[in-house]
């Protein structure tokens, strides 16, 4: 079998991603195709611990990755949001037909308090500040909870075959909507655009807003010897 120079280069690139050592710096990143994997330890000063992250493989529009951590102290504070972010041109919601995604993951460790969630942002202009943050929680582990003005759900929609509790609350000037799965969902496949459509139809969110950010990762509060393994993650905007 003959391989072109491009194919050989692609294989070499994939191999280099697989061999790369984990990275542990507060703002370290790795790029894999259209994904950037962020070791975003933005809240590390709220507690004591460490977190390291690495790419396991990348092929086409699918990435596999992991992050390992131990955090203590500041039990009510998020320590990080290690995530895989898609690189794309900000796009108005009314120009998006679908956002197909698949996410398969598992967690191990002790006394884990964390979420596993998509995190997305909407703005009035392509480069403007965020008006809304939309989160989709596939898991709320150990009692982790979303931002909420009242602590109560505002709706209980069924989207992509999963039952969700919807919460809303402010984070500075940004309104946060969080869809929290009724039960831990370690294998999710659906259209993320359905969540935006729900908010447009039911919560008065404008479909003229720009989708500016698409991320998927975990927010740990506390736990020890924890490891999130993402065996498959893909997402695209159509």
UniProtKB/Swiss-Prot annotation:
Gene Ontology CC annotations of this record: extracellular region
Catalytic activity: xyloglucan + H2O = xyloglucan oligosaccharides
Molecular function GO terms recorded: cellulase activity; xyloglucan-specific endo-beta-1,4-glucanase activity
pH dependence: Optimum pH is 3.4. Stability declines sharply below pH 2.8 and above pH 5.0.
Cellular compartment(s): Secreted
Any Pfam family: Glyco_hydro_12
Membrane spanning stretches: none
Temperature curve summary: Optimum temperature is below 30 degrees Celsius. Is very stable below 35 degrees Celsius, but at 50 degrees Celsius, it loses 80 percent of its activity within 2 h.
Alphabetical keyword list: Carbohydrate metabolism, Cell wall biogenesis/degradation, Glycosidase, Hydrolase, Polysaccharide degradation, Secreted, Signal
GO biological process: cell wall organization; polysaccharide catabolic process
Record EC number: 3.2.1.151
Signal peptide limits: 1-14
Class of enzymatic activity (EC top level): hydrolase
Function: Catalyzes endohydrolysis of 1,4-beta-D-glucosidic linkages in xyloglucan with retention of the beta-configuration of the glycosyl residues. Specific for xyloglucan and does not hydrolyze other cell wall components.
UniProt xrefs under PANTHER family: BLR1656 PROTEIN (PTHR34002), XYLOGLUCAN-SPECIFIC ENDO-BETA-1,4-GLUCANASE A (PTHR34002:SF9)
Protein name: Xyloglucan-specific endo-beta-1,4-glucanase A
Organism (species): Aspergillus aculeatus
Lineage, top ranks: Eukaryota, Fungi, Dikarya, Ascomycota, Pezizomycotina
Gene (name only): xgeA
């Amino acid at each position: 079998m003959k391989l072109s120079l491009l194919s050989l280069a692609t294989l070499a690139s994939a191999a280099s991603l697989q061999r790369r050592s984990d990275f542990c710096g507060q703002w370290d990143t790795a790029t894999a195709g259209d994904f950037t994997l962020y070791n975003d330890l933005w809240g590390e000063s709220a507690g004591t611990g460490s977190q390291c992250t690495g790419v396991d493989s990348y092929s086409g529009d699918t990435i596999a990755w992991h992050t390992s951590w131990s955090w203590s102290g500041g039990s009510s504070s998020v320590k990080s949001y290690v995530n895989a972010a898609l690189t794309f041109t900000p796009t108005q919601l009314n120009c998006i037909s679908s956002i197909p995604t698949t996410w398969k993951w598992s967690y191990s460790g002790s006394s884990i308090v964390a979420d596993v969630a998509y995190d997305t942002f909407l703005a009035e202009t392509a480069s403007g500040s965020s008006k809304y943050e939309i989160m989709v929680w596939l898991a709320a582990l150990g009692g982790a909870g979303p931002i909420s003005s009242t602590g109560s759900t505002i709706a209980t929609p069924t989207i992509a075959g999963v039952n969700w509790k919807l919460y809303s609350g402010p984070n500075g000037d940004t309104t946060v909507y969080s869809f929290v799965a009724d039960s831990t969902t370690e294998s999710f496949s659906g259209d993320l655009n359905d969540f935006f459509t729900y908010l447009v139809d039911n919560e008065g969110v404008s479909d003229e807003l720009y989708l500016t950010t698409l991320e998927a990762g975990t927010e740990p509060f506390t736990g020890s010897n924890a490891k999130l393994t993402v065996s498959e993650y893909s997402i695209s905007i159509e």
